[in-house]
Swiss-Prot record:
NCBIfam families: ftsL_broad (TIGR02209). Residues 1-11 are cytoplasmic. This is Cell division protein FtsL. It is found in: Cell inner membrane. Belongs to the FtsL family. GO terms for cellular component: cell division site; plasma membrane.
Length: 97
């Protein structure tokens, strides 16, 4: 009696099942690769932001360094703090090597 209710599957059903499983796996792989791509892109933009901030800070530091080493600043500090002055020509003595 149990043979009456058993139907045989059409030919090619196993192949269709394999193709369906392959399709599902392919769809999951596409979704995962899209997710991973977005994660990497977010990480890239974050690193680019850090780089831009570091470059801006570097530019400010270079400008500050050039300000601190300017000749007019050094001369004014020497005159004001150390009371230095340019000697008169009569005060200059030549020393032989």
């Amino acid at each position: 009696m149990s043979r009456l209710f058993v139907k045989r599957l059409p030919t090619g059903s196993f192949l269709m099942l394999l193709l369906y499983i392959g399709l599902l796996l392919s769809a999951i792989a596409v979704a995962y690769s899209t997710y991973w791509n977005r994660q990497l892109l977010n990480s890239l933009y974050s690193e680019l932001s850090v780089r831009d901030k570091a470059q801006a800070e570097w530019g400010r530091l270079i400008l500050e360094q050039s300000t601190w080493t300017a000749h007019s600043r050094i001369e004014s500090l020497a005159v004001e703090q150390l009371r230095m002055r340019v000697p008169d020509p009569a005060e200059v003595r030549m020393v032989a090597p």
